[in-house]
Amino acid sequence: LICCASFEEVFAAVKQDSQTIGMLAIENTIAGSLLHNNELLRQSGTQIVGEYKLRISHSFVCLPDEDWDDITEVNSHPIALMQCREFLGQHPRIKVVEGEDTALSAEIIRKENLRGHAAICSKAAAERYGMKVLQEGIETNKHNFTRFLVVADPWQVDELSRHRNKEVNKASMVFTLPHTEGSLSQVLSILSFYRINLTKIQSLPIIGREWEYQFYVDI
């Protein structure tokens, strides 16, 4: 298992060793799409070989010998903080500070013995770093899921396919269109004609070309 500090590092690890399989978040039911990851994926030369949907549940954790009255600051990833806005609104005296990662926030508090600090992370991360769970399930929306993509070097796709338990029933594409009237509608009409279900469409601006876009679709 290779832990990466950024999504860029995930693709770098796959590029460095073609036997390495990468996993990265692409979409959350509350926060929406991670747009930057779409572009990283397009530039990487890797291929999507699967996906995994994970139920997200956040916990409020602190050092083992501290309690609610000791907490003055909470650290976590910006998206996790956003997903717990209702809970944080009930504790206005606690200062909210953004961090790089949910689990990393808990790890830093534990290793550096940051008294008065709490982290928002998973219960598994709390157990791993010996943190005390003050409250579980603090996310605002209990139907909180993140979709992860599994990516690999194109040379590994056939080998991985042999170990798949079911048929491939999903594909992702990226394309650009001429900046003319009805160009996107024509593409969607083709998908409709062949009874292909479009599950997602996302537009991103093309850097250096004003008001022109590329489209990412899942079918």
PLM segments and residue spans:
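Domain-level signature for soluble enzymes in the chorismate/prephenate branch of the shikimate pathway
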Residues: 1-219
